[in-house]
Amino acid sequence: MTFRLMQAALLLSLAGCSASPSQSADAPSIGRPFAVSEVAIFNSPWAMAFLPGSSAALVTEKPGRIWLVDIGSGSKQPVGGVPRVVVSSQGGLLDVKAAPDFTASRLVYLTYSEPSPNRGSGLALARAQLVRDGGGAKLSNVQVLWRDPAGGEGGQFGAIIAFAADNKSLFLSSGERQRFTPAQDPSQPLGKILHLTLDGKPAPGNPMAGRMGAPVVTITDPPRDTEAAKSAEGRQFRWPGPNLTPAETWSSGHRNPYGLAFDAEGRLWETEMGPRGGDELNLILPGKNYGWPLVSEGRNYDGVPIPPGSSRPDFVPPKLFWAPSISPSSLLIYDGKLFPQWKGSGFIGALSGEALVRVTFSGDSAQKADRWDMGSRIRWVGEGPDGGIYLLEDGTRARLLRLTPAKPSG
């Protein structure tokens, strides 16, 4: 861990972790201060990565496809060499990011649900080289850097990649796969934010650096996405080698973390889907526990209440929460020039909310600012090299949209 990251982590750890979460009014904003244009159409897209030094981007589709798209013309071509994925309601080909040194290395990072030798599928983090020759493109030398060896059934993979501010390590969100209890088990990678080297090893300076997990863990499979998961019978899984989960873990107690982004000061923010209500915006601190499934600002899908965060001051509460749910899908912290008034704002894609949500930050606090109705489920939000804000809709005929400043009326 670099001095800058260690310094930021120390300051954040000392900053009021026990503050109450904010749940202010969340009414839709009137009018849109941006124009919306369509760039291209995709089938079940999940994520997008702009490629430095070009007008090209990679778009993943959950069924196992990657497209190379020109964001200027909207033209696209398939990318070959994609690893095999297991497609389910929330599983398949998921996140994609260009490596920090992409211009020189041509490396990209992927997350996906891979076939498990035990049962179902497990989350995998892979790295590959993007090769372009003539009119084609393919992934070469695909290498799995990290995986959940236990596998199993269930959705909620998380699977979001964020490179550290110094570009020497990465953070990976790992959902709890609808099993509840692993989020509080230090020997299971589910329900965690992991901090890894660029080669997928435990990053130096992690809160539990050097610690090993239990060689045998209990897997709730099939999962129970209700309170019943806490008492469900499970199968025993023996780790195929040293269990490095504690050494990999940055934070714990997460449900389905779908957004990870650093602000300009090096703070790591996360958006997380709650159960029925209780979607969260969290400031991620090293070694902290965010409480799931023991506390939440929402309720279980079967209506069984969950104790609120205020009942457990030993857990870190969210900075913001949404009840009813908006189903946050992704997080962008804007740093472009096209919308100077929004520099430093957070933008959250909302699935069930069918909206683009804006939040503002002040140090380690956050405030709800705007919520624009988009009329469709927003799967992903990001910033383009032109400073435009780009959105991917969810679904089998989903548009890639570009947001630019609205022209003054009259």
Language model feature labels by segment:
Residues E114, V144-A150, A209-V216, G298, ...:
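Short, solvent-exposed aromatic-acidic interface loops
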Residues A25-S29, G91-L93, D101-T103, A124, ...:
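Beta-propeller domain segments
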Residues I378-W380:
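Repeated scaffold domains used in trafficking and secretory/extracellular systems
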Residues M1-R4:
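Positively charged n-region of N-terminal signal peptides that target proteins for export
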Residues M6-G16:
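Bacterial N-terminal signal peptides
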Residues I41, G154, G253-H254, M374:
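Amphipathic coiled-coil/heptad-repeat helices and related helical stalk/stem segments
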Residues C17-T181, G259-A261, R267-G274, P324-D364, ...:
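Acidic, Gly/Ser/Thr-rich repeat motifs that build Ca2+-stabilized beta-propeller blades
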